[in-house]
Structure formats: C-alpha cells, structure tokens
Regions:
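Soluble "head" domains of membrane/secretory-pathway proteins
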Residues: 2-37, 48, 52-58, 63-207
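Single-pass alpha-helical transmembrane signal-anchor segments in small membrane proteins across taxa
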Residues: 43-45
Length: 207
C-alpha cells in the first residue's frame, strides 16, 4: 500500500494568464477608416453643392475694378434669387439686354419703382445721395444722367469703374428675368481669394 506524505510541500499554483488587451493598432486603423469615410462624404456633399448651386465664371474687362479684375475667376450663386429679392449693392450676373449670347457683371444701384439720377458723379436714388465706398475717386465719372424711373421688375445696374463701364446708363435697366446669379466668392488669382458679399465655366463680360 502506498501512502502520501502529508508534510510534502504542495506545488505552487500558476496564476491565470489575463486576456489580451484589444490591439491599439487595430483600434487606430478603425478610427482612420471612419475618419476617411466621413471626409470623403463631406467632400462629396461639397462638390454636389458647388455643382448644383454655384457656377464658376470668368470676368472679362475692368468695369468692376477694383473689386474684380480682368480674367478673375469667381463663383456665382445660381439659385439665391429664387428665395430672396435682389438687393441694392448686390453684384449680379445677367444676360446683356442687347445681345443675350453675352453675360455682364455689374452692381445693382436702383430697384424697381425708384428714381435714379446722377449729378456730377454723385448717384441719387429717390432724391437722396447714396453712399458708394466701392467706387474709388479715380474711377468716378463726373457726368450727369437722368432722372430715370426704374420700371417694375427691372433694375438699374452700374460698374464700379464708372469711367469704363457699359451699364444701365447706356442700355437702360435690366429685367429681372435676365439676372441669373449673384457673385459670392473669388477663387483666382489666389491673392483675391475670398468672399464677395456686399461691402456666384462661362465667360462674364464686365465691359
């Protein structure tokens, strides 16, 4: 018969091996994947907005200097006037009333029903001189014009470079149906990069 020595020391117990922690590399990879997906979605949505809401145009001429220069590239908002009215000082793009194959870009000066008059280069709307900080002194035209009553659903537009602008002083007010966008952002050249909010490739003539 075999006996067991009660005094024999027991073998030491081995602690259980803890479960491995989640891989840090795997977690980081998932985060990068999610971040990349969200970035691509954001870029895609931005492109959709630009394509459907905005239109790139090229400015030709200097009549909107110094705000816009010849060959400058800008975006116009094509749908803004479906949701809000045209405002004074808006820089708008429209089909040239005398040749609908051409587009012009000018600033809105007179609204429907208003009286527009120019005396020694100062523009009066309904008998009151309007403030025009966007027209530098060297670009002022001291000629007289009007008075003229702007017909309903039409707008009196002028270039900021008054001396070289072919605008409503020449071809008269522009019908709202010919106005198809508002200038909102300049993107080229890079030193002009920024908003064109009041202080939207086709070719836009600003002569």
């Amino acid at each position: 018969m075999h006996s067991t020595d009660q005094n024999q020391p027991l073998a030491p117990s081995v602690p259980a091996t803890p479960a491995p922690a989640p891989s840090t590399t795997h977690s980081l990879r998932n985060e990068i994947r999610v971040w990349t997906r969200d970035l691509l979605i954001a870029i895609g949505l931005a492109l959709v907005i630009i394509v459907f809401l905005y239109q790139p145009v090229k400015v030709e001429g200097t009549s909107m200097a110094p705000l816009l220069s010849d060959q400058e590239r800008i975006f116009i908002n094509k749908f803004v006037y479906r949701f809000e009215p045209i405002h004074r000082r808006d820089v708008v793009v429209f089909w040239y009333p005398l040749d609908h194959s051409k587009s012009f870009i000018k600033r809105v000066i007179g609204l429907p029903g208003e009286s527009v008059e120019i005396r020694q280069g100062i523009v009066y709307v309904n008998g009151r001189a309007i403030d025009e900080p966007y027209v530098p002194t060297q670009y002022e035209d001291m000629s007289d014009y009007g008075p003229l009553r702007v017909p309903n659903d039409m707008y009196f537009v002028m270039g900021d470079h008054r001396i070289s602008s072919n605008d409503s002083r020449v071809f008269g007010p522009v019908a709202s149906k010919f106005i198809y966008g508002r200038a909102v952002f300049a993107y080229w050249p890079v030193d002009h990069f920024g908003s064109l909010s009041t202080t939207e490739a086709s070719s836009t003539d600003s002569k």
